[in-house]
């Protein structure tokens, strides 16, 4: 079996491969977006359930397409979760040591950078996460977030400017 979904060939083996390949990455992404690791794990499970049900309609031909497709499902589910009345993102943060995106022995600089990224407004935090933690391109991010590529470039530039200013105030990275 290859690295991409085969339309019309949905199987448990395919689902297992996707979970093994993308599970940790999606959990890290959802954890950053939601600030709650347990809720993120629930969202990732729902992501794979939805992906499994929709495998026959997936038209990706490249492994990157599969990653972007799964990420789009997960990000949309996170957005839905944040829209719920009871969920207040600003009250939820997660320590860097719990992130799967970071090495277990994260350096002090990595911890400071993560903490600073967490202070960004959600729309900038999303693009930073997808670009630098998931290594997605601006066009892939645009597809995931259903926004124009130019908008993504603008948000990335603005987010980097904000990070630079905030890190300079902390005397970091100088």
Per-region residue spans from a language model:
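C-terminal flanking helix
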Residues: 23, 27, 48, 121, ...
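N-terminal module of bacterial RNA polymerase sigma factors
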Residues: 1-25, 32, 56, 115, ...
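DNA-recognition helix of helix-turn-helix
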Residues: 75, 79, 139, 145-170
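Conserved RNAP core-binding helix
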Residues: 19, 27, 37-54
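Arg/Lys-rich amphipathic alpha helix in sigma70-family domain 2
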Residues: 57, 72-92, 106
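A short pre-motif secondary-structure segment
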Residues: 127-131
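Σ70-family region 2.3-2.4 aromatic/basic alpha-helix that recognizes the −10 promoter
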Residues: 48-52, 63-83
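Internal acidic/polar
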Residues: 88-115, 137
């Amino acid at each position: 079996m290859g690295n991409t979904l085969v339309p019309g060939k949905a199987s448990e083996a395919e689902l297992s491969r996707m979970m093994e390949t993308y599970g940790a990455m999606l959990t890290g992404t959802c954890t950053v977006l939601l600030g709650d690791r347990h809720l993120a794990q629930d969202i990732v499970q729902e992501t794979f359930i939805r992906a499994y049900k929709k495998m026959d309609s997936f038209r990706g031909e490249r492994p990157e397409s599969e990653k972007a497709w799964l990420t789009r499902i997960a990000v949309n589910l996170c957005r839905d979760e944040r829209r719920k009345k009871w969920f207040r993102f600003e009250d939820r943060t997660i320590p860097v040591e719990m992130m799967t995106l970071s090495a277990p022995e994260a350096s002090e600089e990595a911890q400071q950078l993560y903490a600073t990224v967490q202070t960004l407004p959600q729309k900038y935090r999303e693009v930073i996460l997808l670009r630098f933690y998931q290594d997605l391109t601006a066009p892939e991010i645009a597809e995931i977030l259903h926004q124009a590529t130019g908008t993504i470039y603008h948000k990335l530039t603005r987010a980097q400017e904000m990070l630079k200013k905030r890190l300079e105030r902390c005397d970091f990275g100088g």
